[in-house]
């Protein structure tokens, strides 16, 4: 890859004037109000539930609604967006560390890792990193379409899926509204995993060979949960021993919600790997052979 191309990518992902001058505010950022957030989440739950009830009442057979390759196109779009956000926030974090490191002497931040875990008190939601956090927040609403696809394809609506998607949108909003610490590492790990998972779904959606591991997607999500746990422990340590982290109240609420998601995921993971579930999957495979 040529130096000119690398410089061009770096400019458009971290040095563009709009990215550098970004500021999260109700007047400048679409979707930045509490009313928009709660209305969108309520609409998502209402539409998903209504569609599930309607299809269950109208379509008595087990046939799914034909969607063509719309889910696969959605997966490709989400994979590209996730990879772009990952690259953008990685380059932006490096640029912010380069430009603001001299200010860290006013706080107890000593290393880039400490800054990634714990924003200094008084951090404002503006600049490169928060631009990509805003883009990530908007993509949470695109992610919700997977629930619609699941209802149309199988007429199943998982309450856990509604809860997890709603929580992701809510916590992404908290990151911006309260300049919450830890969000950079959370976005990096989430977008990295999502770019792989959505790319895998796009690949297998067209009937191409899948992973040799049947639980590939679930294992990727398990890695993401593990990264979140380590990051949360790091934030708490920094807050207690380094004089406080910005947005720690929002981080506390975020931790509670992530704990609820963790319990739901572990319950699903245990049930999926139980002997009874493996026996059922084996019987279904033999029946379809």
Curated annotation (Swiss-Prot):
GO terms for cellular component: membrane. Pfam families: ELO. Its main location: membrane. PANTHER family: ELONGATION OF FATTY ACIDS PROTEIN 3-LIKE, FATTY ACID ACYL TRANSFERASE-RELATED. GO terms for molecular function: fatty acid elongase activity. InterPro entries: ELO_fam. Belongs to the ELO family. Its EC number is 2.3.1.-. The keyword Transmembrane helix applies. One of its GO terms (biological process) is cellular response to abscisic acid stimulus. The gene is HOS3. It is found in: Membrane. It comes from Arabidopsis thaliana. This is Fatty acid elongase 3-like. Disruption phenotype: No visible phenotype under normal growth conditions, but mutant plants show decreased abscisic acid (ABA)-induced inhibition of root growth and seed dormancy, and enhanced ABA-mediated stomatal closure. The chain crosses the membrane at residues 35-55, 75-95, 129-149, 157-176, 181-203, 205-225, 248-268.
